[in-house]
């Protein structure tokens, strides 16, 4: 991923954060206080600045009740051996015939 793509992803996260804050009808000052960060840090988050600490983002997810969204981040994928050992379930190819 190049720097341009990274900035784009962070900008999108910031835009979503701002939308969720506004949906709660919170001012920047009130929301920043809930996060335990300065208004400047919140502004940086909403603008997608890369230097914001991950802890501020985790706290924002918690305040917005989106902390479960982190479960998939860096989740360990099953190894090929585990996938081979996993029980296979048969999937129906078509509906049964009607009499």
Predicted feature residues:
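A short, Lys/Arg-rich alpha-helix, primarily the initiator
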Residues: 1-23, 73
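Short, basic-rich loop-to-helix N-cap that marks the start of a DNA-contacting helix
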Residues: 49-62
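Short, charged recognition helix plus adjacent turn
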Residues: 71-99
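Short basic helix-loop element that most often maps to the first helix and adjoining turn
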Residues: 15-30, 91-98
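Short alpha-helical DNA-recognition segment
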Residues: 25-43
